[in-house]
């Protein structure tokens, strides 16, 4: 999969996330995906774990991610992401922040994602 296809996949996945289409998100991930649970300080390692994490998160808040730029990092892809969390009425719970999501791929699917506060760490 080339960089253009990877960018398209991440953009589509971000839209699915913002629309709470969990099964569409899981469809672009390998079965043993590694996904960060930032609040819990752990790494989730399966579709079932990621699904449960997102469904619990969506019950309490409405996180929104907007990828604004992409940088190839070897075989990985780093997305510059504007992120903000809202309540279900649309009131912001957090200020918008910029974070960096680094995606690793296996074949045409996401194998892992990590979150970084700064660009240099994401590209390292």
Where are these regions (language model features)?
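Short, low-complexity N-terminal intrinsically disordered segments enriched in polar/charged residues
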Residues: 1-27, 31, 122-124
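A beta-strand edge to alpha-helix "cap/lid" segment located at domain peripheries
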Residues: 1-5, 51-124
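A solvent-exposed, acidic/Ser-Thr-rich amphipathic alpha-helical stretch
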Residues: 22-74
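Preference for short coil/turn "hinge" residues that link or interrupt alpha-helices
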Residues: 15, 19-22, 26, 37, ...
């Amino acid at each position: 999969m080339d960089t253009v296809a990877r960018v398209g996949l991440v953009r589509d996945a971000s839209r699915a996330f913002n629309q709470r289409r969990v099964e569409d998100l899981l469809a672009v991930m390998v079965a043993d995906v590694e996904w960060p649970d930032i609040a819990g300080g752990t790494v989730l390692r399966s579709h079932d774990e990621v699904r449960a994490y997102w469904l619990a998160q969506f019950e309490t808040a409405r996180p929104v991610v907007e990828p604004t730029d992409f940088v190839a990092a070897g075989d990985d892809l780093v997305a510059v992401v504007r992120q903000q969390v809202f309540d279900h009425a649309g009131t912001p719970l957090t200020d918008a922040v910029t974070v960096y999501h680094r995606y690793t791929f296996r074949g045409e699917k996401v194998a892992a994602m990590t979150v970084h506060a700064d660009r240099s760490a994401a590209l390292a």
